[in-house]
Amino acid sequence: NDIRHNLSKLHRNIEQVAAAGAQLVVLQELHNTSYFCQTEDTDMFDLAEPVPGPSTGFYSELAAGYGIVLVTSLFEKRAPGLYHNTAVVFDKDGSIAGKYRKMHIPDDPAYYEKFYFTPGDLGFEPIQTSLGKLGVQVCWDQWYPEGARLMALKGAEILIYPTAIGCLLYTSPSPRDISG
């Protein structure tokens, strides 16, 4: 969980895609670190930060510096004992256009997110940006269609789900490894 290394890598990658003409950049779920929710570890709470906070300052500068709309996913510490998996959207000028706190929190052998996160309380409100209205939710929320429906009914033009699914490390061969 080398945050400085991850931020440096994210900065380089954002710079690359912005130079290639990207206007909207969506980072994966909980991108400041590797996905830590596969175990229950109280030390991981040290990774949480307020919103706004250090990471939002960093991403605000990137959005403004490259003139992009940027969607991030952060481990938010809202208050002592109150933590969220929060998507924060930055407009092209670096301002925080809005945020969404993940509502559907998985808890199974691969995802111990209920150990870390409280379900969100901000509802399903599209976020107005210079590119249009974004319907932002986070990962597991995509399996519950009512959020997408409510966002669309309220005018969302694009649905976005930062997700960590697909970046998990396999302990057995992946289907690609055994397909021959």
Where are these regions (language model features)?
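Cys-nucleophile CN-hydrolase/nitrilase-fold catalytic domain and related Cys-dependent amidase chemistry
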Residues: 3, 12-92, 99, 166-172
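Generic structural signal for secondary-structure transition and capping sites
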Residues: 67-68, 132, 176
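Single conserved hydrophobic/aromatic residue that forms the stacking wall/gate
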Residues: 170-180
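Loop/helix-junction capping segments adjacent to catalytic residues or to phosphate/diphosphate-binding pockets
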Residues: 41, 145, 180
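Conserved protein kinase catalytic core
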Residues: 35, 105-108, 180
